[in-house]
């Protein structure tokens, strides 16, 4: 049986001298305790040395992918086919490929693994012609080359640093929040007014660290942290504070906590700058599109930049909202429109009704930027700047469209003005000068009811005036009737009635708004005939 053993220096093919020893797997390691014992079990048959590290890297990358290198193929055809013996290999996948392409029987079992372990332990004694120093140097060079190839290593492109930095930044924010809240509550017993005057947490801790006890504010100078007005307000509040007195030991512990808050805040600022620089080095286009914090959170959520590049735009859009998505799918409701991408500046500055559209468009352009950063050779951010400008223009159009609808200018812009030739003669419309009331179009019921009420009130007032005038005329006519002969009373009374009717009809005709003449009804005609007959 032959054994294929791969080293950093070259391929080695050993021949097993005593196969009976291989049956005892548990005690096989004893046969490789010394080089002399190892030479009794296996013997080197052929050694194919690599010329340089590049050739060794190509050979090992092919082995990891389960492929046969040209150099290995030549060795196997030359040595193993002539021997007509089975070949022991360390990788079962490689054995299957050798059997398929070269028609050689390959063996892979726990015995073979133990045999490989023994050969590796006595490699210097089993492979003559290779110095230990050369073997170690070749081993180290191949290890570095192989790691660089597998990890796609670059000094500037290590997204693991981004994942750890953004996670640490979130943890620092939580810790700072807890520490500052505890500090304000703790010192609030001694000087509660200070928390209302100074809203900035870092300034609050710096003032507290410099002054300490409330009594020292009168003589302390806080111009480094506060303006003159705020400083005067703090000193005035310290004199009339309603806080309790505390011991020096309590003040010391509070000051230690303030020191921790200030140090963590400074480290957080430094870490944020580091994250900005690292994001611009690894994913400049993504940073331009969504910002360094959102981009770093997307990379951390996916695990790496390469994993994020494999996601579709629809997945990137809702990345971070998985719970809401599955809850919506379970309850058959509307799925969420955005996840972590909601915190991007483009989505934040858009109106609520346009956030869904902008997040969808931003996700599509962000995926292009991610793939460009992950697989592209160019490290510039030109593509991200161009796509961001397009999205900003699109957002501006959407926002302007909504403003035009509200103001009513959209219709005016949509309709083109009617073309009028210079030779056309414009005529004057005299109907605009008419002062006569005209019948308007159909109006609303509420307006008609209001106008009816107004006309009724006017009609009542007119009737009251008419009655007063009629009564005066009646009194005058009665005085005249006393002087007239008794034969004519009936005729005069009828004339009085006609006058009353005539006076009542005149104001009513003035109140009618329409210009059309009223047609007399048949009942009125009959009454007029009767009056004429009576006069005759």
Swiss-Prot record:
Name of the protein described by the UniProt record: Nucleolar protein 58
Chain positions with Phosphoserine modification: 109, 304, 351, 509, 521
Record carries keyword Cell division: no
Numbered residues of crosslink Glycyl lysine isopeptide (Lys-Gly) (interchain with G-Cter in SUMO): 467, 504
Superkingdom of this protein's organism: Eukaryota
Cross-link Glycyl lysine isopeptide (Lys-Gly) (interchain with G-Cter in SUMO2): residue positions: 157, 353, 411, 415, 422, 426, 441, 444, 465, 467, 492, 504
Keywords: Isopeptide bond, Nucleus, Phosphoprotein, Ribonucleoprotein, Ribosome biogenesis, Ubl conjugation
Biased composition (Basic residues): 492-502, 524-536
Cross-link Glycyl lysine isopeptide (Lys-Gly) (interchain with G-Cter in SUMO1): where in chain: 467
Assembly, per entry: Core component of box C/D small nucleolar ribonucleoprotein (snoRNP) particles; the core proteins SNU13, NOP56, NOP58 and FBL or FBLL1 assemble stepwise onto the snoRNA. Interacts with NOLC1/Nopp140. Interacts with NOPCHAP1, NUFIP1, RUVBL1 and RUVBL2; NOPCHAP1 bridges the association of NOP58 with RUVBL1:RUVBL2 and NUFIP1. Interacts with PIH1D1. Part of the small subunit (SSU) processome, composed of more than 70 proteins and the RNA chaperone small nucleolar RNA (snoRNA) U3.
Cellular-component GO terms for this entry: box C/D methylation guide snoRNP complex; Cajal body; cytosol; fibrillar center; nucleolus; pre-snoRNP complex; small-subunit processome
Function of the molecule: Required for the biogenesis of box C/D snoRNAs such as U3, U8 and U14 snoRNAs. Part of the small subunit (SSU) processome, first precursor of the small eukaryotic ribosomal subunit. During the assembly of the SSU processome in the nucleolus, many ribosome biogenesis factors, an RNA chaperone and ribosomal proteins associate with the nascent pre-rRNA and work in concert to generate RNA folding, modifications, rearrangements and cleavage as well as targeted degradation of pre-ribosomal RNA by the RNA exosome.
GO aspect biological process, one term: snoRNA localization
Family statement: Belongs to the NOP5/NOP56 family.
Subcellular compartments: Nucleus, Nucleolus; Nucleus, Nucleoplasm
Annotated region (Disordered), positions in chain: 414-440, 470-536
Family matches, as SUPFAM superfamilies: Nop domain
Gene name tied to this protein: Nop58
Organism expressing this protein natively: Mus musculus (Mouse)
Stretches assigned to the Nop domain: 282-400
PROSITE patterns: NOP
Location (main, coarse): nucleus
